[in-house]
Amino acid sequence: MARKKLMRFKWNEEVHNLFQPEKENYKAYKGKWHEYFKNDNPVILEVGCGRAEYTTGLAALFPENNYIGLDIKGARLWKGSSLSIETGLTNTAFIRTKLQNLEEFFEPGEVKGIWITFPDPKPRESEAKLRLSGLRFMNIYRRLMPAGGKVFFKTDNRVLFDHTLEVLTDQTLKIKDLVFTHDLYQSPLLAEHYGIQTTYEKTYLNQGVQINYLKFEFLPL
């Protein structure tokens, strides 16, 4: 196991599509992701991407978009990075970072969409500011996206989901077209997921847990 982990760390250090602190170009593409991708296509993020099932799955389905997966764990990012290389995906990239540092990698208006897929619910009140669907992060997403930018959120955790719905009532966020379901797999909204499932999602479904999902769009500030 240790040998496999070392091989993955070495991959992360050498591969071109994964950005991490040890690399000189770690933050080089802020405001210039079109230079990395060599096109002006929309940039869509998967925050807390884990194994990056949505980053790679959506990238394969929609080559007209660029997808970037972000996570703090390099071992997780290895999966998306290596799969992208193996399958010839040129419209993906991966960044190892704490997600509160998003604005160090993107200029305001540079991001057109954000997927939040099964984040850690951070149930303690002392951890509230670390919830990826909390007000602190929603304000970060708001600054990164222009009017029309879309956020998509999936979780098995009903408490976190209901908290997120409450967060979205904050008038300073200025959102529209909020749509949600507490049971995605019994909803017409399921078609928007194109059969993509995360590892966590498969586990929860096997346990009979319902999946919550919402999406909305930002209005002009």
Swiss-Prot record:
Catalytic reactions on record: guanosine(46) in tRNA + S-adenosyl-L-methionine = N(7)-methylguanosine(46) in tRNA + S-adenosyl-L-homocysteine
Residues reported in the UniProt entry to bind S-adenosyl-L-methionine: E46, D71, D120
GO molecular function annotations of the record: tRNA (guanine(46)-N7)-methyltransferase activity
Swiss-Prot/TrEMBL keywords: Methyltransferase, S-adenosyl-L-methionine, Transferase, tRNA processing
A Pfam match: Methyltransf_4
Family classification: Belongs to the class I-like SAM-binding methyltransferase superfamily. TrmB family.
Name of the molecule in the record: tRNA (guanine-N(7)-)-methyltransferase
Species the sequence originates in: Cytophaga hutchinsonii (strain ATCC 33406 / DSM 1761 / CIP 103989 / NBRC 15051 / NCIMB 9469 / D465)
